[in-house]
Amino acid sequence: ILDLREFPDDPYGNRVVHDIQTILDDPEVGYVAECMGGVNPAYQFVRSCLEAGKSVATSNKQLVAEKGDILLQVAKEHHVNFFFEASVGGAIPIIRPLHTCLAANDISEVAGILNGTTNFILEKMFCDKMKFADALALAQKLGYAERDPSADVDGEDACRKICILSSLVFEKHVYPECVYTKGIRDISLEDVQLAQSFGCAVKLIGAVKRLEDGKILPTVMPMLVPFESSLLSHVNGVFNAVMVWGDGIDKTMFYGRGAGKLPTASAVLGDIIDEIKQTDTVLSQTWACLLYTSPSP
């Protein structure tokens, strides 16, 4: 366990190390879970682990959104795996289903509620008639929002997640700076009430669709979502939901808790367990392809 802190009273306190090299040099370490957040030093640590022949599972959405293409290539070159199911949707299984259950589909669009904090705030504004500042303060009090909520309320978190989904579905790496992003900071109680009068909820939607000319359009913005025609309008609280449109399935929705330590841990451990089950194969996961291949000697 790499950490700068000491945990003398923890039953695993003797496993804590302070130098990544200790992990890299240990031949008994075959699988690494990265949950640091941010790009640096996580990128250097993850890349070093992959180059040392250790598979990595991460929950770090910023790392995957900005460096996922490079890390997937490094993993492929060293015949190990780089998994990131926990980077989008917490406990919602969406990364792997896009490449397994839905692999036969020509996917045309992905859209969803990808940030539980903003969804909670908008619900409180809608149901309890709270102003934005009051709803945000409540989210912070309950631990749903950080002291600095910018990444959530300005749409950065949802942007990183739609980048990952876009890259997986449409065969190219989509960087956050290429996505039009508008958060909910300027949404007023009057806006929410006006939407309600039209039979709609206001939701922060991350979406990507293929256009007629073959280009793709990724966006993150508040949208009016009709109650009568969209399941997303009924997704409340800190829950997330992702809808996928394909030529074979028409549309399907993945729903569940999108954040929190236990949902995130569930997804990270699920990746590690899947890796352990595939001890005789290398699961080569890249943007827009996922193949089982024989491992190199």
Regions found by a protein language model. Give the residues of each.
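Rossmann-fold NAD(P)-binding glycine/threonine-rich loop
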Residues: K61-F82
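ATP-dependent carboxylate/acyl-activation modules
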Residues: S229-L291
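Substrate-binding/catalytic subdomain of NAD(P)-dependent oxidoreductase enzymes
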Residues: D134-H234, F239-A241, G260
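N-terminal glycine-/serine-/threonine-rich beta1-alpha1-beta2 phosphate-ribose binding loop
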Residues: I1-E51
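General beta-strand structural signal in soluble alpha/beta enzymes
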Residues: V17, A33-E34, A57-S59, F82-A86, ...
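Conserved small/polar residues in nucleotide/adenosyl-binding loops
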Residues: Y292-P297
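Rossmann-like NAD(P)H-binding beta-loop-alpha module
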Residues: F83-A145, E156-D157
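ADP-ribose/adenylate-binding Rossmann-like module
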Residues: L50-E66
